[in-house]
A protein has these predicted regions:
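Chalcogenol-based redox active-site neighborhoods
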Residues: 1-153
């Protein structure tokens, strides 16, 4: 399914590192929902650390960050602790939300083709509508770009 800006973000429930079950529709503020391939890999670590560094500014702009990957809660907790990540990580081991949000697709690395998570960020407003989507994200300065867009809401 191809999601678009100005459309309602699909609701979902997933296990989280902070509360037992996270439900999107229960959050009544702006949300930065970013999908990343794997805990403790170079690009994913940089992205998590960058969002973490900006977490206070994001909070001041009435928003919260949530990262989603197919890693387990156990893996997420280890990743959070190792890098002092200041926001919640959600586990989608069954790929249900990853597929619902259209971020599962063909990728290639070192000439090898495979299926995986396409690094994507959704900025969702407090009414649950998608404000902006970043696909095939380049990690460098991405968190700053998202914060800049958040300030426009």
């Amino acid at each position: 399914m191809k999601l678009k800006a100005n459309k309602k973000a699909p609701n979902f429930k997933l296990p989280s590192t902070r509360i037992s079950i996270f439900e999107l529709n229960k959050i009544k503020k702006n949300i930065i929902l970013y999908f990343y391939p794997k805990d403790d890999t170079p690009g994913c670590t940089i992205e998590a650390k960058d969002f973490s560094k900006l977490n206070n500014l994001i909070s001041k702009n009435k928003a919260s960050v949530y990262g989603i990957s197919k890693d387990s809660i156990k893996s997420h907790l280890k990743f959070k602790k190792k890098y002092k990540i200041k926001f919640d990580l959600l586990s989608d081991e069954k790929l249900s939300v990853i597929k619902k949000y259209g971020v599962w697709g063909k990728k290639s690395f070192l000439g090898k083709k495979f299926m995986g998570i396409i690094r994507t960020t959704f900025l969702i407003n407090s009414k649950g509508k998608i404000h902006k989507i970043w696909s095939n994200v380049r990690v460098k300065d991405h968190a700053k770009e998202v914060l800049s867009e958040l300030k426009k809401i």
